[in-house]
From Swiss-Prot:
Belongs to the eukaryotic ribosomal protein eS21 family. This is Small ribosomal subunit protein eS21. It is found in: Cytoplasm, Cytosol; Cytoplasm; Rough endoplasmic reticulum. Its main location: cytoplasm. Component of the 40S small ribosomal subunit. Interacts with sta. GO terms for biological process: lymph gland development; regulation of cell population proliferation; regulation of translation; rRNA processing; translation. May be an associated component of the ribosome rather than a core structural subunit. May act as a translation initiation factor. Has a role in regulation of cell proliferation in the hematopoietic organs and the imaginal disks of larva. One of its GO terms (molecular function) is structural constituent of ribosome.
């Protein structure tokens, strides 16, 4: 779709599940999006960094969302590897 200036714009950009790489549809009301922020260990305040994970409803229905979040957090270095 084009706007008045002739630039291509998207009306809807679908999210993808971080665990299974499936597209999260607009009607998937069981899906969740978690944002984990970096915290300064001395002050306990939020820094500028953050990581966002989107989990689709199918993963949550199977009861695998906690394992998927731990796996993704280990891969990104948020949780230690021997957790």
């Amino acid at each position: 779709m084009e706007n008045d200036a002739g630039e291509n714009v998207d009306l809807y950009v679908p999210r993808k599940c971080s665990a299974s790489n499936r597209i999260i549809h607009a009607k998937d009301h069981a899906s969740v999006q978690l944002t984990i922020v970096d915290v300064d260990p001395e002050t306990g305040r939020q820094t500028d960094g953050s990581k966002t994970y989107a989990i689709c409803g199918e993963i949550r229905r199977m009861g695998e969302s906690d394992d998927c979040i731990v796996r993704l957090a280990k891969k990104d270095g948020i949780i230690t590897k021997n957790f």
